[in-house]
Curated annotation (Swiss-Prot):
One of its GO terms (molecular function) is rRNA binding. HAMAP family: Ribosomal_uS4_B. It holds the Pfam family Ribosomal_S4. Belongs to the universal ribosomal protein uS4 family. SMART domains: Ribosomal_S4, S4. One of the primary rRNA binding proteins, it binds directly to 16S rRNA where it nucleates assembly of the body of the 30S subunit. Part of the 30S ribosomal subunit. Contacts protein S5. The interaction surface between S4 and S5 is involved in control of translational fidelity. The lineage of its organism: Bacteria, Bacillati, Bacillota, Clostridia, Halanaerobiales. Transmembrane segments: none annotated. NCBIfam families: PRK05327.1 (NF003717), rpsD_bact (TIGR01017). Residues 98-161 form the S4 RNA-binding domain. The keyword Ribosomal protein applies. GO terms for biological process: ribosomal small subunit biogenesis; translation. This is Small ribosomal subunit protein uS4.
Amino acid sequence: MARYKGPVCRLCRREGEKLYLKGQRCYTDKCAIDRRSYPPGEHGRRRNKPTEYGMQLREKQKVKRIYGILEKQFKRYFDMAEKMPGVTGENFLSILERRLDNVVYRLGLATSRNEARQFVLHGHILVNGRKVNIPSYLVDEGDVISVKDSSRKSKRFKEVFEFNEDLTPPKWLSVNLEKAEGKVVAMPTREDIDYPVEEHLIVEFYSR
């Protein structure tokens, strides 16, 4: 399946909540879900009671859309989480949070995960001083993530830093926007997930 390239605001309306896929627009009164909170389409205003399977599927789709991941890779992360010690659902969320594009977003080096993915792909991001252009790269404790010197002076990055100047990163990350860099000070835990998610539904979906 190809990556979704349509209007991302439709995805938020489909899930019935903000997924913060549009960056700065999501924080303004132009946000589509604030104006039309029902799903898109001819029958969008109808609200049928979902089945158990439907609830599991919706939760899976929601988290996939938040992180911008396709099914094959999403399932691979789940398989990794199952093999790790501890609670599968919590392991799964921790893996998703450790993706480089997500970390760039969490640090405030981008205004959305999609923008962070583009920054990584175009070689603007360094990990421990070396360019990493793989959005799915999983960071480890102690890693330093920074914006390349030649890139941080660009108009777009200056706009990003200004927009995120008051941002407080999750406790597993530290950031210095003046230096355009941050550090992974710990591994993310369930407490660090700041969006509503019932990960047990995803576990149940893949355990059917």
